Amino acid sequence: EGNTGPEGHAYSRPPQVEGEATNRAIMIADMAGVPLYVVHVSCEDSHEAIRRARQQGKRVWGEPLIQHLTLDESEYFHPDWDHAARRVMSPPFRNKQHQASLWAGLQSGSLSCVATDHCAFTTEQKRFGLGNFAKIPNGTGGLEDRMPMLWTHGVGTGRLTPNEFVAVTSTNIA
């Protein structure tokens, strides 16, 4: 369709593909008899695959990123190309409907912790992808913002209790 900007990154990585990849990884781990830790859970499809596997007694854990809990795909359509490119990461941000599932997973325990995948690039480095989103280096910052963002958007809004906050940032990881 001629999408060459940061929005093309999101279009090229739909949530259904993430969900299918999660299902496949769960199946392979189960066949091999090994546990599975799914990183960067960004969508309902992936979370639901993890939730079902855990209900079946499989040793599967899932980890959303703070970015996927608080930002959405509208970031890629920002009129400032630099702003949009600074948010290119994989998987990409999804529409807001997926966030409700991720928060529910943290509340119920089907998703076990929150991470950042901190991998920052300068604006100059991100500009390598001008005219071709596939050349935008994947990664965003987030390490310094994870705890206050999770407290504000989790505990501060009633999505998480203080005990759930401690669990998804410390206890479950240990």
Could you describe each region identified by the protein language model?
Residues 1-114, 130:
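Histidine/acidic residue-rich metal-binding segments in metalloenzymes
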